[in-house]
């Protein structure tokens, strides 16, 4: 190294530490004056380090999500028909309204049933509802609601029904390639710029489609392009895994939700719960499942016992007992939450059923065999 070259610490030859701090505070103040308070901050000085959440209405799903739907984020819920997508969002709306919040429902499918919503606890008198004519209109309404900072949750049902104006004004059979994807991409850029400041949770419901010609891997995909997949902080895949019956009469379904993406908590968790026709998510059923896993309620054969006493034969009868004894159910819930806070592992807060993406990709690839003995 030449004799005249010296190594110095960054900034030591320019200004002292005190001068640098003064200059930094000056520029931070200038940025806040120009762009508003909170436009830049030290992460340790943030008033809300922990992301606030909205309950999903199902204790098992709250556990899988790390508390519920995150406030000020985009959430996507997708799955096949009649799997419980709308029911999930109506429960979230009911939870927001219970806390005194304001909720909006953008009904692009024009299929909202106010009687069913009311049966789930939604205050339909104060629910903001829009039935837009075009996708542009729907997303512009969402953007204005988010910008207002006066709405706590906005639900869009669904992305597949957000039809671009060019498609509506055209004739049947006209092809407009990528119009909906471009619309969603532009909308997500606008909405996410303000959603964090407003604290509004935006939930998009989406439908599944099949990719043509896929021989390896999952042929399913969601509508509206890839923008929503990137901008969403949480993506939930909900499936109907069982039909609940009493004799020959169907009274509900068993739903499984996979947390396909989560930016605010560990992803790839799985939650199961019952959805009862006309009543929505069985909160008592979720509580019983967790009580059994944590050992608060013990099952021996067909009988369930609590504190050594049999409380019901079979799951359905035990749920009825808990509904008829709300004080005991409250005590059980307190004990369950205490166990969970102590770190007790249950199915909903551990990653068990999903393979790592790399392993799935490896199994999806065709195997090439070489040599004369390959067929053997």
UniProtKB/Swiss-Prot annotation:
ATP binds at residues 79-86. Pfam families: RecA, RecA_C. It comes from Synechococcus sp. (strain CC9902). Keywords: ATP-binding, Cytoplasm, DNA damage, DNA recombination, DNA repair, DNA-binding, Nucleotide-binding, SOS response. One of its GO terms (molecular function) is single-stranded DNA binding. The lineage of its organism: Bacteria, Bacillati, Cyanobacteriota, Cyanophyceae, Synechococcales. HAMAP family: RecA. InterPro entries: AAA+_ATPase (IPR003593), DNA_recomb/repair_RecA (IPR013765), DNA_recomb/repair_RecA_CS (IPR020584), P-loop_NTPase (IPR027417), RecA-like_C (IPR049261), RecA-like_N (IPR049428), RecA_ATP-bd (IPR020588), RecA_C_sf (IPR023400). Residues 357-376 are annotated as: Disordered. Gene3D superfamilies: P-loop containing nucleotide triphosphate hydrolases (3.40.50.300). This is Protein RecA. Its main location: cytoplasm. GO terms for biological process: DNA recombination; DNA repair; SOS response. Signal peptide: none annotated. It comes from the Bacteria. It is found in: Cytoplasm. GO terms for cellular component: cytosol. Can catalyze the hydrolysis of ATP in the presence of single-stranded DNA, the ATP-dependent uptake of single-stranded DNA by duplex DNA, and the ATP-dependent hybridization of homologous single-stranded DNAs. It interacts with LexA causing its activation and leading to its autocatalytic cleavage. Belongs to the RecA family.
């Amino acid at each position: 190294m030449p004799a005249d070259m010296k190594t110095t610490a960054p900034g030591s030859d320019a200004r002292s530490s005190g001068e640098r701090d003064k200059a930094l505070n000056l520029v931070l103040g200038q940025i806040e004056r120009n762009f508003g308070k909170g436009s830049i901050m030290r992460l340790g000085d943030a008033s809300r380090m922990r992301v606030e959440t909205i309950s999903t209405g199902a204790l098992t799903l709250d556990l899988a999500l790390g508390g519920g739907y995150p406030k000020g984020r985009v959430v996507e819920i997708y799955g096949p028909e009649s799997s419980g997508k709308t029911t999930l969002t109506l429960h979230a709306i009911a939870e927001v309204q219970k806390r005194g919040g304001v909720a909006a429902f953008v009904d692009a499918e024009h299929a909202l049933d106010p009687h069913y919503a009311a049966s789930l606890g939604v205050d339909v008198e104060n629910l903001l509802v829009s039935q837009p004519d075009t996708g542009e209109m729907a997303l512009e309404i969402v953007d204005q609601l988010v910008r207002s900072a006066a709405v706590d949750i906005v639900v869009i049902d669904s992305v597949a029904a957000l039809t671009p104006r060019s498609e509506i004004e055209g004739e049947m059979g006209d092809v407009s390639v990528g119009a909906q994807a471009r619309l969603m991409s532009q909308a997500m850029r606008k909405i996410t710029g303000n959603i964090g400041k407003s604290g509004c949770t935006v939930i998009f419901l989406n439908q599944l489609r099949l990719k043509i010609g896929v021989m390896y891997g999952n042929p399913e995909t969601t509508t509206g392009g890839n923008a929503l997949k990137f901008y969403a902080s949480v993506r939930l895949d909900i499936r109907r895994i069982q039909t609940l019956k009493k004799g020959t009469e169907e009274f509900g379904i068993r739903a499984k939700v996979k947390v396909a993406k989560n930016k605010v908590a560990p992803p790839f968790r799985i939650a199961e719960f019952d959805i009862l026709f006309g009543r929505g998510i069985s909160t008592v059923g979720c509580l019983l499942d967790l009580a059994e896993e944590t050992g608060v309620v013990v099952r021996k054969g067909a009988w369930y016992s609590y504190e050594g006493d049999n409380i019901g034969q079979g799951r359905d009868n035990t749920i009825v007992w808990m509904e008829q004894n709300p004080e005991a159910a409250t005590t059980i819930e307190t004990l369950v939450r205490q166990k969970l806070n102590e770190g007790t592992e249950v199915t909903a807060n551990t990653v068990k059923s999903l393979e790592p993406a790399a392993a799935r990709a490896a199994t999806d690839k065709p195997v090439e065999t070489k040599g004369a003995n390959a067929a053997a």
